[in-house]
């Protein structure tokens, strides 16, 4: 992976490429090769090839690779090497103290074999140095074998472990059980504390406990992990031990990934790709806490030279027909760190066989035409954010065994290949800001973790008619160039980060929207004064837990005039939206209570109050050319956000109701509902529709339409259209007509 045209790009034999990949088994490889795909990821067969201490059976893996080669002579392969699954029971049997231990809220051990939902054989502790050492030897042996026998056919290796091979900790999906209470985890925690604090006195000051010692510190109890002291928030004065443990869990998890990645790189002499799943910061119902998952150490992963790419499936909520495609990780952050993001496009086509589908059945495509519309929407999202992706035959049921689908994939492959020649600058003027570390400072299972992040994005903010960028909180000071920032879950903010963000947003022309308790927690205390400092509006703390909901005040500001109904919003799902969420316990959605924050500033213009009370909960203040908005509840309505964005100078490409991406010269517009739509170019630019020239197999500006400031086009339901932007002189930007034909 090297930089090319301003972004990290995959090089194969010295040639840069931006092509899509696929995932599947040999039985489906012809479906993808027919569609112009030449890179295929596949699962290494179970039971595990790692059969004993430095004992390996590569036979089934060899047979699978040989079958790929026989069916598709030019395919390049990416084995997905997963640790901990069936066939590795022998390791746990001989190292019982190195397995992750889960306890229920009463501190009673739970038998993992009775609650596991996947064929897990060895649920190794993230703190196990013995497992890491042995697995590293096995990883080296696997890569060495593959390179010696199939080196010219292997593109690289994806390393998996934990639940779903996505490095979720083993107990993460088990309701109301907490980890890790194994001897290995306890010793790892003590090592972490020694590295962090150095001596007992520093530890005692941090934990505010005179009796604690580095040599005897224990993993916090399940009850402490389960319930924060401040209902939703953790108090650093009395819960620093909990946060230290959760940070240790992620650090150890990342450490195992990094060790295996380095060994794999060494075994292939740094000539092949190595990547992993990681950084899932956008939760759904059973991934509610990156802290519990072990996914808070993204910065460490991004700094590891042995890791070339990071991948994740796209989000499972509201993803089918009429829904939207967004990553579960942070693709732009990954790209800014110089690594590839690989989007796992596990879209269910009309050939999927219920219940073997990805996500809920609501909105499944009924035919090839609807399948193609979903896949084009997916491609638009990937090309409009960062990196590339693989088309996934998730259950090896041949979801792509359709000539219409294969023709569409070939068209999208050509567009991806052509994009190699384009610059990659994002034209988004609104950025949503998420924070991985803050997940350690809040309730691990509250639905508020979703409401303040992914539910709002998936349900309210996707189709506002302008593109969105994503930043992590620690990137705002360096990369923030937006007109509008939405700070979603930035509960914890230390002094340096706080100063960087304030310096970035307190500038003329910048609007910042702060949700709930952004900045409430710092290193040593929870304090409403922290919120006041960050938001720039004087705030008051309401300690009584309540459901955060806001009712708009008619006539309070032009931005809420002629407000859409309902006039209230917050941590509550309507029935039609529940149908578009990934399945989960209904009771989960009723657990969204939290202390709240009220505006107490005469200079602020209050436009909304909490439902069930009169406390000001939504307010705007304008000072020295910058604007700050406090919003005490999640799910700020999309129409209201669109109005705030327009007031702040954000260019609207379309009216609300369409999802827009604009990266380099490529503009994509996806419209869930059928209807006429006008697409308007940003100031100083012209746009022209793109069309696919079948005879040349290339995307071209439509010769029937000249570059112009706006284009009006009828859209079918769930249709995506592509446009190319050029400067106001009409000078055509490079379309990469030559492309990389080797990708086909």
Please tell me what each predicted stretch does.
Residues 28-112, 133-134, 141-149, 259-268, ...:
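Aromatic-lined substrate-binding rim segments of carbohydrate-active enzymes
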Residues 270, 275-456, 462-463, 541-593, ...:
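Hydrophobic targeting/anchoring helices
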Residues 22-29, 295-301, 459-479:
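A short, well-structured beta->alpha microelement
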Residues 93-309, 313-316, 324:
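Polysaccharide-binding and catalytic clefts of secreted carbohydrate-active enzymes
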Residues 1-36, 418-421:
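N-terminal carbohydrate-binding accessory modules
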Residues 371, 488-744:
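A conserved amphipathic helix/loop scaffold
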Residues 16-23, 43-59, 115-137, 236-255, ...:
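The substrate-binding groove and active-site-proximal loops of carbohydrate-active enzymes
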Residues 18-22, 40-42, 77-81, 155-159, ...:
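Hydrophobic faces of well-ordered beta-strands that scaffold small-molecule active sites
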């Amino acid at each position: 992976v090297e930089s090319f045209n301003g972004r990290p790009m995959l090089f194969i034999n010295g040639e840069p490429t931006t092509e899509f990949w696929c995932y599947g088994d040999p039985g489906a490889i012809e479906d993808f090769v027919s569609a112009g795909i030449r890179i295929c990821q596949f699962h290494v067969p179970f039971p595990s090839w790692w059969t004993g201490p430095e004992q390996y059976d590569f036979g089934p893996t060899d047979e699978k690779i040989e079958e790929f080669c026989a069916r598709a002579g030019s395919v390049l392969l990416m084995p997905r090497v997963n640790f901990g699954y069936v066939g590795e029971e022998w390791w746990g049997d001989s190292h019982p103290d190195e397995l992750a231990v889960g306890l229920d809220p009463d501190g009673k051990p739970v038998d993992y074999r009775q609650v596991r939902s996947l064929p897990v054989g060895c649920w190794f502790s993230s703190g196990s140095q013995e497992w890491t050492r042995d697995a590293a030897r096995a990883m080296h042996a696997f890569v060495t074998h593959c390179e010696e026998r199939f080196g010219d056919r292997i593109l690289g290796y994806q390393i998996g472990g934990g639940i779903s091979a996505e490095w979720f900790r083993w107990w993460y999906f088990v309701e109301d059980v907490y980890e890790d209470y194994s001897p290995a985890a306890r010793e790892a925690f003590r090592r972490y504390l020694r590295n962090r604090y150095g001596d007992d006195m520093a530890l005692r000051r941090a934990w505010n406990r005179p009796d604690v010692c580095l040599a005897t510190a224990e993993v916090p109890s399940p009850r402490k992990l389960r319930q924060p002291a401040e209902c939703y928030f953790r108090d650093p004065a009395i819960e620093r031990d909990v946060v230290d443990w959760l940070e240790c869990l992620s650090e150890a998890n990342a450490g195992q990934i990094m060790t295996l990645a380095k060994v794999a790189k060494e075994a292939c002499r740094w000539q092949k790709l190595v990547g992993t799943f990681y950084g899932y910061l956008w939760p759904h119902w059973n991934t509610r806490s990156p802290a519990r998952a072990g996914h808070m150490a993204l910065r460490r992963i991004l700094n590891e030279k042995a890791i070339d790419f990071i991948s994740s499936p796209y989000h499972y909520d509201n993803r089918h027909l009429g829904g939207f495609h967004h990553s579960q990780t942070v693709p732009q952050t990954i790209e800014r760190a110089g690594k590839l993001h690989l989007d796992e496009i596990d879209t269910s086509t009309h050939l999927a066989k219920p219940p073997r589908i990805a996500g809920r059945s609501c909105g499944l495509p009924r035919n090839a035409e609807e399948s193609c519309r979903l896949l084009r929407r997916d491609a638009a999202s990937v090309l409009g954010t960062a990196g590339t992706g693989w088309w996934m035959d998730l259950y090896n049921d041949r979801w792509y065994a359709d000539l219409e689908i294969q023709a569409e994939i070939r068209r999208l492959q050509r567009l991806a290949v052509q994009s190699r020649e384009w610059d990659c600058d994002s034209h988004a003027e609104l950025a949503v800001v998420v924070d991985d570390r803050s997940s350690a400072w809040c309730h691990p299972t509250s639905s508020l973790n979703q409401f303040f992040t992914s539910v709002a994005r998936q349900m309210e903010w996707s189709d506002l008619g302008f593109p969105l960028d994503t930043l992590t909180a620690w990137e705002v000071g360096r990369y923030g160039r937006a007109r509008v920032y939405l700070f979603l879950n930035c509960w914890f903010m230390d002094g340096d980060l706080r100063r960087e963000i304030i310096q970035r947003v307190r500038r003329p022309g910048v609007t910042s929207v702060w949700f709930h308790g952004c900045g409430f927690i710092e290193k040593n205390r929870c304090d409403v004064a922290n919120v006041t400092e960050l938001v720039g509006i004087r705030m008051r703390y309401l300690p009584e837990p309540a459901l955060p909901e806001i009712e708009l005040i008619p006539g309070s500001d032009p931005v809420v005039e002629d407000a859409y109904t309902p006039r209230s919003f917050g941590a509550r799902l309507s029935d039609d939206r529940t149908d578009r969420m990934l399945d989960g316990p209904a009771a989960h959605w009723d657990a969204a209570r939290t202390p709240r924050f009220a505006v107490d500033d005469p200079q602020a213009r209050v436009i909304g109050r909490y439902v069930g009370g009169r406390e000001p909960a939504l307010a705007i203040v304008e000072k020295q050319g910058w604007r700050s908005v406090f919003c005490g509840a999640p799910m700020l309505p999309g129409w209201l956000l669109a109005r705030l964005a327009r007031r702040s100078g954000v260019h609207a490409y379309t009216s609300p109701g369409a999802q827009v991406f604009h990266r380099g010269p490529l503009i994509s517009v996806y419209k869930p509902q059928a209807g006429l739509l006008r697409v308007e170019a940003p100031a100083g630019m012209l746009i022209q529709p793109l069309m696919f020239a079948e005879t040349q197999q290339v995307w071209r500006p439509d010769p029937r339409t000249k570059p112009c400031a706006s284009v009006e086009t009828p859209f079918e339901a769930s249709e995506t259209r592509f446009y190319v932007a050029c400067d106001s002189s009409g000078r055509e930007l490079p379309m990469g007509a030559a492309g990389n034909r080797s990708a086909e």
